[in-house]
Swiss-Prot record:
Protein name per Swiss-Prot or TrEMBL: Zinc finger protein NUTCRACKER
ZnF locations on chain (CCHC-type): 169-192
Subcellular location: Nucleus
PTM comment, free text: Inhibition of transcription factor activity by KIN10-mediated phosphorylation at Thr-98, Ser-178 and Ser-182 under sugar deprivation conditions, thus delaying flowering.
Phenotype caused by lack of the gene: Delayed flowering. Roots of the triple mutant jkd mgp nuc contain patches of undivided ground tissue (GT), indicating that cortex and endodermis layers are not fully separated. The quadruple mutant line jkd mgp nuc scr has short root meristems, lacks endodermis and miss Casparian strip.
Annotated positions binding Zn(2+) 1: C144, C147, H160, C164
Disordered as annotated region, ranges: 1-29
Effect of mutating S182A: Strong reduction of KIN10-mediated phosphorylation. Constitutive transcription factor activity
Keywords assigned: Activator, DNA-binding, Metal-binding, Nucleus, Phosphoprotein, Repeat, Transcription, Transcription regulation, Zinc, Zinc-finger
GO BP terms in the entry: asymmetric cell division; leaf senescence; photoperiodism, flowering; positive regulation of DNA-templated transcription; protein localization to nucleus; regulation of DNA-templated transcription; regulation of meristem growth; regulation of timing of transition from vegetative to reproductive phase
Biased composition (Polar residues): 1-23
Length: 466
């Protein structure tokens, strides 16, 4: 008998063979497909086809909106009221589930200034709109006994009370959080605020250094930048100026150089400048002013003697040259004596009808206003012959406070001084010759070309040369 049972089992005639579990699952999935879970709309993004309901704050916050007309008892839901009416033997009706889909309802916040007051930002359930109104616009009635934090929704207060004091997140600023997400949000904001504060403090510090002129500030060293373009000026003692605008004429760009006003034809028009009060000096070096004459008088005199003896650009042609830097000596290599200059001036051919210019020995020097070779513009700003002895940026050396004897010694060291002496004394020598003075009356020929002293000395004749 045992053998028969074994044969029956092996043949499968007496028992059904079990099916695999994978086959069963596949069959069940075909018979009952899984229900697709409908996703919930995000807060503030209602269904466009939903019914929008607007409730007043009183109705929204009422705890028992549904009241019994017999006993006056209130209920939160209409279903509860219907069940209560059944106890009073009143007609009652419960909502029946139907196959027809019920239209959705959305609720707007009664607060007009709230973003959820608009229908496009309505909330999808009545409980949600209640909690929103309590949290944002309601009174906070519940307070935590441990941390004294207040809440407007009772459920929020209960949830906080369960975790308060058990977990603690402390920020560097001293704020304590019990929730990690709140701590992370605050920490990001706090770090960004600290970074911005550090930037503002750094900028304020740099501005303070710049205003105070401290080393390392953003201010540039003007003397260092311009040192390669403007030669250093020797200190000098300035004299009072009558021109109120002379402070604005300290730095002038160098103009094109020329041999002289008589010989050069490419000279640029000179810039308007104030009157010069010294034979040797510069009225524009206000940046090197020294107010104390007694302290620096000896040093200034030594600098004047050294500069006059070593300057190579002050040759005779530079007596009538325009303003130029000290190193621009390309056109100053032609040396002419005072007699040659007078002969050249006489050959230009100016005439005069008056002899008043010969009465004053300084008239000759005062009759040389700077003029441009360009006949369309004339700069007659009172610059007399005294301004022509040197360049603007180099010879700010002499002043009226110097001793007369030291100035005379300095003049005798260079050709310019001898030329100036010859020019200043020429009218007097001529008058002595004509008047029969100490030289002798008419025995020798002094006027080489026969043009007369009047022609050379009158201001109009000088203007004719130029």
């Amino acid at each position: 008998m045992t053998s028969e049972v074994l044969q029956t089992i092996s043949s499968g005639s007496g028992f059904a063979q079990p099916q695999s579990s994978s086959t069963l699952d596949h069959d069940e999935s075909l018979i009952n497909p899984p229900l697709v879970k409908k996703k919930r709309n995000l807060p503030g993004n209602p269904d466009p086809e939903a019914e929008v309901i607007a409730l007043s704050p009183t109705t929204l916050m009422a705890t028992n909106r549904f009241l019994c007309e017999v006993c006056g008892k209130g209920f939160q839901r209409d279903q509860n009221l219907q069940l209560h009416r059944r106890g009073h033997n009143l007609p009652w009706k419960l909502k029946q589930r139907t196959s027809k889909e019920v239209r959705k309802r959305v609720y707007v916040c009664p607060e007009k200034t709230c973003v959820h007051h608009h229908s496009s930002r309505a909330l999808g359930d009545l409980t949600g709109i209640k909690k929103h109104f309590c949290r944002k616009h309601g009174e906070k009635k519940w307070t935590c006994e441990k941390c004294a934090k207040r809440y407007a929704v009772q459920s929020d207060w209960k949830a906080h009370s369960k975790t308060c004091g058990t977990r603690e997140y402390r920020c560097d600023c001293g704020t304590i959080f019990s929730r990690r997400d709140s701590f992370i949000t605050h920490r990001a904001f706090c770090d960004a605020l600290a970074e911005e504060t550090a930037k503002i403090n750094a900028v304020s510090h740099l501005n303070g250094l710049a205003a105070a002129g401290a080393p390392g500030s953003v201010n540039l060293n003007y003397q260092y930048l311009m040192g390669t373009f403007i030669p250093p000026l020797q200190p000098f003692v300035p004299q009072p100026q009558t021109n109120p605008n002379h402070h604005h004429q300290h730095f002038q760009p160098p103009t094109s150089s020329s041999l002289s006003l008589w010989m050069g034809q490419d000279i640029a028009p000179p810039q308007p400048q104030p009157d010069y009060d010294w034979v040797f000096g510069n009225a524009k070096a206000a940046s090197a002013c020294i107010d104390n004459n007694n302290t620096h008088d000896e040093q200034i005199t030594q600098n004047a003697n050294a500069s006059l003896t070593t300057t190579t650009t002050l040759s005779a042609p530079s007596l009538f040259s325009s303003d130029q830097p000290q190193n621009a000596n390309a056109n100053s290599n032609v040396n002419m004596s005072a007699t040659a200059l007078l002969q050249k001036a006489a050959e230009i051919g100016a005439t005069s009808t008056t002899t008043a210019a010969t009465n004053d020995p300084s008239t000759f020097l005062q009759s040389f206003p700077l003029k441009s070779t360009d006949q369309t513009t004339s700069y007659d700003s009172g610059e007399k012959f005294f301004a022509l002895f040197g360049s603007n940026n180099n010879i700010g050396l002499m002043s009226r406070s110097h001793d007369h004897q030291e100035i005379e010694n300095a003049r005798n060291d260079v050709t310019v001084a001898s030329a100036l002496d010859e020019l200043q004394n020429y009218p007097w020598k001529r008058r002595r010759v004509d008047g029969g003075g100490e030289v002798g009356g008419g025995g020798q020929t002094r006027d080489f070309l026969g043009v007369g002293v009047q022609t050379l000395c009158h201001p109009s004749s000088i203007n004719g040369w130029i």
